[in-house]
Amino acid sequence: MSYCRQEGKDRIIFVTKEDHETPSSAELVADDPNDPYEEHGLILPNGNINWNCPCLGGMASGPCGEQFKSAFSCFHYSTEEIKGSDCVDQFRAMQECMQKYPDLYPQEDEDEEEEREKKPAEQAEETAPIEATATKEEEGSS
């Protein structure tokens, strides 16, 4: 016997093996092709920003959402030669807001940043002698 149970926001449906093997008779509702927020990504067809895009990771709706929207909008619509150079104040306001919520917007530690900068330099040092040796060998064989 099949039955359904609601637990908070979840709806749990229990079915028998026979119910599960029977083809579904559910009718799918076609998506509204005029829905401006459906499957368009970050930029809507009209050029506006889709603040509901999952690609923004919820930044537009967090405690600094208004500051994020202001900075992002300024950058998106910027017509300066160096895009976004006219948005320093908006980005500064967003950064100040984010610093008030370090648990939600973790700052990159200076130590982590230095480590990341050192790694490419160390890798370049490791490969440099190999490349130099290969060049000398090529010159000797010519």
UniProtKB/Swiss-Prot annotation:
Alphabetical keyword list: Disulfide bond, Mitochondrion, Oxidoreductase, Protein transport, Redox-active center, Translocation, Transport
Record-annotated disulphide pairs: C53-C55, C64-C97, C74-C87
Post-translational modification: Forms intrachain disulfide bridges, but exists in different redox states.
Chain positions of motif Cx9C motif 2: 87-97
Renumbered ranges of motif Cx9C motif 1: 64-74
PROSITE patterns listed in its UniProt record: CHCH (PS51808)
Regions of compositional bias (Acidic residues) in chain numbering: 106-115
GO biological process annotation, one example: mitochondrial disulfide relay system
Pfam families tied to this protein: CHCH
Annotated compartments: Mitochondrion intermembrane space
Annotated CHCH domain residues: 61-105
Tissue specificity remark: Expressed in all tissues tested, suggesting an ubiquitous expression.
Gene Ontology cellular component annotations, sorted alphabetically: mitochondrial intermembrane space; mitochondrion
Region (Disordered): 101-142
Function statement: Central component of a redox-sensitive mitochondrial intermembrane space import machinery which is required for the biogenesis of respiratory chain complexes. Functions as chaperone and catalyzes the formation of disulfide bonds in substrate proteins, such as COX17, COX19, MICU1 and COA7. Required for the import and folding of small cysteine-containing proteins (small Tim) in the mitochondrial intermembrane space (IMS). Required for the import of COA7 in the IMS. Precursor proteins to be imported into the IMS are translocated in their reduced form into the mitochondria.
Complex and partners: Monomer. Can form homooligomers. Interacts with GFER and forms transient disulfide bonds with GFER. Interacts with MICU1. Interacts with COX19 forming transient intermolecular disulfide bridges. Interacts with COA7 through transient intermolecular disulfide bonds. Interacts with AIFM1; the interaction increases in presence of NADH. Interacts with NDUFB10; assists NDUFB10 oxidation, folding and import into mitochondrion.
Family annotation (PANTHER family): COILED-COIL-HELIX-COILED-COIL-HELIX DOMAIN CONTAINING 4, MITOCHONDRIAL INTERMEMBRANE SPACE IMPORT AND ASSEMBLY PROTEIN 40
Note on domains (UniProt): The CHCH domain contains a conserved twin Cys-X(9)-Cys motif which is required for import and stability of MIA40 in mitochondria.
Protein's name in the database: Mitochondrial intermembrane space import and assembly protein 40
